[in-house]
């Protein structure tokens, strides 16, 4: 059975921390592919600084060197707010026999009960969780206790051994704006940023 990983984010800009966790995601779950999903209008996130077209282009350039990585614009072409359940449904229809895995940070896991149709979502996809520094499963709200306990036991939720890399897109944008410093950004994305003058004051 084909295993497909789904990795959503604003990617504003895409940085090495994203690649660190995407590779761990692929390796630990044994994925055939990881699909990067740049957000259009994400419901649970602040607005992005770069345009959707620029963020998509940066992700496409940065992921081109790893054959396991693919990119989809399905969240961008939807003009309304995008919800994870709707995105997963797109891939479920496209790959009806595949095993889907959604990658999320532990901060998102701890708020999963606030997501649209979360109880239906977890029937459609498995979940891989990258723990953020300071987070613990002991913080899981009671609304998720029963489900998470069962899911950890049956393997439909996996906690990755690699933690979420402590890299901040906000800090990277600040460094780019203040000094043009592109540390932590894949070279192809850094070249695109310089060429198009993104994140300048």
UniProtKB/Swiss-Prot annotation:
Pathway(s) of this molecule: Cofactor biosynthesis; NAD(+) biosynthesis; deamido-NAD(+) from nicotinate D-ribonucleotide: step 1/1
GO molecular-function terms, A-Z: ATP binding; nicotinate-nucleotide adenylyltransferase activity
Gene Ontology biological-process entries: NAD biosynthetic process
Keyword Plastid: no
Entry keyword set: ATP-binding, NAD, Nucleotide-binding, Nucleotidyltransferase, Pyridine nucleotide biosynthesis, Transferase
Enzyme Commission number(s) from the entry: 2.7.7.18
InterPro entries named in the record: Cyt_trans-like, NadD/NMNAT, Rossmann-like_a/b/a_fold
Pfam families: CTP_transf_like
Positions in coiled-coil regions: none
Domain of life according to the entry: Bacteria
SUPFAM superfamilies: Nucleotidylyl transferase
CDD domains in alphabetical order: NMNAT (cd02165)
Functional description taken from the UniProt entry: Catalyzes the reversible adenylation of nicotinate mononucleotide (NaMN) to nicotinic acid adenine dinucleotide (NaAD).
Family affiliation: Belongs to the NadD family.
Protein's recorded name: Probable nicotinate-nucleotide adenylyltransferase
Record organism: Neisseria gonorrhoeae (strain ATCC 700825 / FA 1090)
Lineage, top ranks: Bacteria, Pseudomonadati, Pseudomonadota, Betaproteobacteria, Neisseriales
